[in-house]
Amino acid sequence: MTQQAIFAGGCFWCVEAVFNQIKGVEKATSGYINGTTENPTYKEVCTGETGHAEAVKVEFDATVISYEKLLDIFFSIHNPTQLNHQGEDVGTQYRTGIYYLNDEQEQLANKKIAELQPHFAEKIVTEVLPAQTFYPAEDYHQGYLLQNPQNSYCNLVATPKFLKAKVKFEEIWK
C-alpha cells in the first residue's frame, strides 16, 4: 500500500538522493512546502520570502518500509538541532521539518523527537506541522546529486551525507 511522507532537512538534493535509494521507497521528489506563494520557483524560495521549506515528498510501500524507519533515516541525514540552516545553507527554506499527512504521522513524529532528544546536547528544533500544498521543484532539481556528482556543493556537502547513509542503511539500500 503506497503512502506518502514529507520531510525537510536542509538542501533537498541530499535528502531526496538518500530516500530514492531505500528499498520500499517508490519515489522521492524534491519540492517546496508550507509557504504562502502558489507555485513558487527555486529563485523565489531562495529569497526566504515565500515561507517555503525545501522538502522531499517520499512515496513508499508501507508493507516494505515503515514510516518509523523513514523517520530514523531522516534524523540520521541532517542535524535537527540547527534552526533555519544546515551547515552553510542558511535561511528559513533550510529549516528542519516533518509535514504530516494524518494524525498517526504526527504522533509518530513527536514520539521519535521525544526518543531522540536525550541523545542531543542541543534542543531538537524540527517543526512538526500539517502538510500544506507540496509543489514539486523544477525538473533540474530532481535526482540532482546523482546526476551532478562533480558539482562542488555535492562533493563537499551532499555526497558525504549520502555515502554515510549508504553505510548506515546498507541492509535496506537498493
From Swiss-Prot:
Known InterPro entries for this protein?
Answer: Met_Sox_Rdtase_MsrA_dom, Met_Sox_Rdtase_MsrA_sf
List the catalysed reactions: L-methionyl-[protein] + [thioredoxin]-disulfide + H2O = L-methionyl-(S)-S-oxide-[protein] + [thioredoxin]-dithiol; [thioredoxin]-disulfide + L-methionine + H2O = L-methionine (S)-S-oxide + [thioredoxin]-dithiol
Any GO BP annotation: protein modification process
One Pfam family linked to the record: PMSR
Taxonomic superkingdom:
Bacteria
Q: Which UniProt keywords apply?
A: Oxidoreductase
> Which cysteines bridge via disulfide bonds?
none
Q: What is its EC number?
A: 1.8.4.11
Q: Which family does it belong to?
A: Belongs to the MsrA Met sulfoxide reductase family.
Protein name per the record: Peptide methionine sulfoxide reductase MsrA
GN (gene name): msrA
